[in-house]
A protein has these predicted regions:
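Non-catalytic DNA-recognition/assembly elements of restriction-modification systems
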Residues: 3-33, 159-171, 175-187
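Short coil/turn segments at secondary-structure boundaries
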Residues: 3-5, 36-44, 135-137
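Sequence-specific dsDNA recognition surfaces
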Residues: 8-9, 24-35, 47-77
Length: 187
């Protein structure tokens, strides 16, 4: 039998109509830095790490933003570099039509137009992906740990056909609803 290095990279078996892809192969994001202080009276929609837990971006004026940010688009998926064990993955959803969308440089931005963003979020929140993230961190531990974008872009993720992505998203939403319903009845 011939040695095939390709199969050594396959993390686990997937259905025949799914494909394994490296994040770098699907990511169309090209970084564009914006200094909000150059537009002090403009208001921005800012995806920052501290506001992640609220589920909502913040809406500061340019004069109140201390550092340059990265311009993002609706549908981009943000993967937090800081403390990757905290599993912070966020889908950019435009709240205010007239505001420029920005993200902190502490996010790895994934723009994969052919893949449903919610599916990417679920995949990147999975134990499989979390284990990958934790396998190549830098820093001495605790709050100093960082995911390395050069490694992350080489991680392989399973991509099903669009209809299957939709089904997975719907099924996970149903399970989450069941969990929330049960949790609300507990003392």
């Amino acid at each position: 039998m011939r040695h095939s290095p390709h199969y050594e990279q396959i993390p686990f078996e997937i259905p025949d109509n799914w494909v394994w892809v490296k994040i770098d192969e699907i990511n169309k994001f090209k970084s564009k830095t914006v200094n909000p202080q150059n537009s002090p009276t403009d208001q921005f929609e800012l995806y920052s790490v501290p506001t992640f837990e609220t589920g909502e971006p913040e809406f500061p004026y340019g004069k109140d933003v201390a550092s340059s940010k990265v311009e993002v688009e609706e549908g981009d998926v943000l993967l937090c570099k800081i403390n990757p064990h905290l599993n912070r993955v966020w889908r950019v959803k435009r709240r205010m039509a007239q505001m420029k969308l920005l993200a902190s440089s502490e996010w790895i931005v994934i723009r994969a137009n052919e893949i449903i963003p919610e599916y990417l979020v679920l995949t990147m929140q999975s134990p499989y992906f979390r284990e990958l993230m934790m396998s190549n961190v830098s820093g001495v531990g605790g709050s100093l740990m960082r995911a390395q974008p050069t490694f992350v872009k080489q991680y392989m993720i399973p991509i099903p056909p669009v209809r299957e992505q939709e089904r997975i998203i719907e099924k996970v939403a149903q399970f989450n609803l069941y969990i929330d319903t049960i949790a609300s009845t507990l003392p």
